Every structure is written in structure tokens, then in C-alpha cells.
Amino acid sequence: MNFAAMMVVAIGIDLALGWPDALYKRIGHPVTWIGALIARLEKGWNFKGRLRRLRGVLVALAVIGTTVVIALAVQLWLPAGWPGVLIGGILAWPFVALRSMHDHVAAVAKPLIAGDLPGARQAVSMIVGRDPSQLDQPGVARAALESLAENSSDGIVAPLFWGCVAGLPGIAGYKAINTLDSMIGHRTDRYEEFGWASARIDDLVNLIPARLTGLFFALASPCRARALAVMARDARSHRSPNAGWPEAAMAGALAVRLSGPRIYADRVANEPWLNGTAPDPRPADLARGLALYRRAMAGMTLVIGLVAVLWSVS
């Protein structure tokens, strides 16, 4: 089956519809179903003891395995040819977040550009974990741009990459891994041991997509050479083995500095700067970042479309 064509169908539906509120109210969302399973297993299995890390490994394998097996069973049921591609694309659609990512960041950009800092702080609190009350205008713009860059990889490029590789088991399995990481893959007393496997698996499956995302941002920039240079120089200085690639490319493309020190509700994180000699982002840079995002994601869609065409004629 042409998995790349399946992903093109999913992209098209997501761009047209997003995930409608009426549908969410009626059935929720597949990621929330996965999250509910994780929460139930975490509640029963995450307690202190010598085998805490092993229990976390078993929970990660159970969640990923359950998701992949269900998705594989559905995929094997699909009819052959283009009807199967169309149905598969519809089923893959919930795992694509092109439209919602843009809308969430645009909801920050609108009040920020209008000078409504409280409104921008409220909007950015929906997409980042840091304390919004501590953010000035450049801080809000920086937080939103970093979220846009990192989540372009985690929420869009990576699931589509694995969807192209393996179809429904690939895209659904990736979202299970990413949801595990977001829920239990934290370096806290509660999760450092229990979430160890989830965090390591997430690092592994994002190695290629994160670098592809950085490349898409760099190639979509009018200043390609600068974006590529900043990405190559600074990406590895990020605390994450993957997030630094799209964030550094974004910083170089927009000629601003990203990452750096930030305040969370429970701690201060003194992170190194990406493109540290550049100025802080301004409100207008957030609009430029959204434009870069649109061009980069259009380029990604074109690449997937070309793969689909080559797949169909091979």
C-alpha cells in the first residue's frame, strides 16, 4: 500500500478541517485515548522500589505494543489500492497537527502584535510549560517560536515520517511514544526512573525527523546558508538531542536568539542560547516564524507527495 499517499490524504483533511470541536466533544481524540491508558497504567505501576525502571519499561512496551497491534489490524483490514489509501488517510488524519499547531501559535501572535501582553501570556500558556507571568514581549515571542519549532518536529514531521515508513502502525505507534514521553518522560523524582524508557525511545524515534524538520526550516528560509550554519553550529548545545535542530534552524532563519534561560513554575532552567549573538525576537518575528512554518510544511508536503508519486509508478 502507498503509505506516502495515505499521509497526503491525512494532511489534506487536517488542513481543511483540523480536529473539529464537535467531533472532539463526541468521541474525544485518539491521543487522549492513549493518554488515558498511560494514566491508568502509571497509577497502578509507578511506585517506589528497585524495579521501578523495569515497570516503566513494561508500561512503555504495553502502550506502544497495544497501539501498534490495533493499528496494524486495522491496516490489514483495509481494501487494496486507492480505496485503502483513502480510508487509511482518514484514519491517519487525527495524528496530524498541521492546522492546530499554526492556530495555537497564531493565537499568541495576534494579541502580542496588538500590544496585548496579558492576552499573549494567556495564549502562550496553552503551548508551553514555563511561567507566563514572568514573560515580557520578547519572552512570549521566544516561547512561542520555540514551541512552533519543536512541535513541528514532534507533532507533524515525525508522525508523518513514520507514517510514510509503516502506515497506520507507524503514525499511531509514534504518537503513542510521544505521548508517553510527554506524560511520564520527565526528570523528576516521580518519573526519572519510571519514565526512563519512554524518554529514551522518544529520543530514538525523533533522531531523523528532528533533523529533517531543521532542514525544512532552513531550506524554506530566504537566508538558507545562515539557517544551516546556525543549525550545524548550535543544535547539539540544546539539552535535548533532537529539539535543538529545528529550534536552531528557526533561530538562524529569523536572525533571532532562542532557548536560553527560562523560568518554569517549579524551577529555573539555565539553557545555552541558540544563535546567541542575535537579538531577542520581537512580536513581528512571530508572524515571520509562522510564515516560515507555512513554507516549510508546504515543502514537506511536496516531498511526501513526490514520494507518493514515485511509489505509485514503481
Curated annotation (Swiss-Prot):
Topology with respect to the bilayer: Multi-pass membrane protein
Write down the NCBIfam families for this protein, in alphabetical order: cobal_cbiB
Cellular localisation: Cell membrane
* PANTHER family, alphabetized: COBALAMIN BIOSYNTHESIS PROTEIN CBIB
Keyword terms of this UniProt record: Cell membrane, Cobalamin biosynthesis, Membrane, Transmembrane, Transmembrane helix
- Specify the protein name: Cobalamin biosynthesis protein CobD
* Entry-linked InterPro entries: Cobalamin_biosynth_CobD/CbiB
Cited function:
Converts cobyric acid to cobinamide by the addition of aminopropanol on the F carboxylic group.
Tell me the gene name. Answer: cobD
Cellular component terms, GO, for this chain's entry? plasma membrane
Q: Which organism is it from?
A: Rhodobacter capsulatus (strain ATCC BAA-309 / NBRC 16581 / SB1003)
All disulfide bonds of the chain are none
The portions of this protein that span the membrane are: 3-23, 57-77, 78-98, 154-174, 290-310
